[in-house]
């Protein structure tokens, strides 16, 4: 099946979105709260009709919630994953508020693929831990050039404080115990979800290409909140601090 066939196939894209949400919530039961606070801060800083870059957009989870809350917003989603982009393309087909771009964030020239030179807000969630610190720092420098003055960048992700190993171990044990209970009730984990996608007649091709790019999972990094805030300031943002956190994750906001 070609990419054109994927975009025009009759498929329940919303069902795939919901399946992705359930799989992600298995890891992050407070995922919706992160999104709510993220959009609260978008409204607080840049208003209700922002031009947004959904960075490493995946299926477009941020974009969907952005447009539901702010109908006058526009979103550019950028990702490299063919399968997740196929779901995003199917979901937002015909919506001229959404542009989807295929690009590798490790490519220094990826911003040239975007339809705009600047954005009010760049938003990302549970994605940039796939990058090691050096390419992530380089990415932060490029983002500083994309966010307009007074605009924001927000990253919701795993940010580990390595100075608190006992607290980290206790949190990790509790989280994994909860995840095991959920698995016994039939919740799909990461591997099972991708196995399901590989069997779908529409997503099988994009999923195969996805594995050619990434393998089973990328080997990334989870530096501390302090590291992220320091590097963002060094790369051109004026302010940076957490605006929400859970025992394992943080939503960090940087203002240009």
Task: Label the predicted regions.
Residues 137-149:
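A short glycine-rich, Lys/Arg-flanked "PGG" loop and its adjoining helix->strand segment in the class I
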Residues 1-47, 61-65, 154-186:
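Conserved class I S-adenosyl-L-methionine
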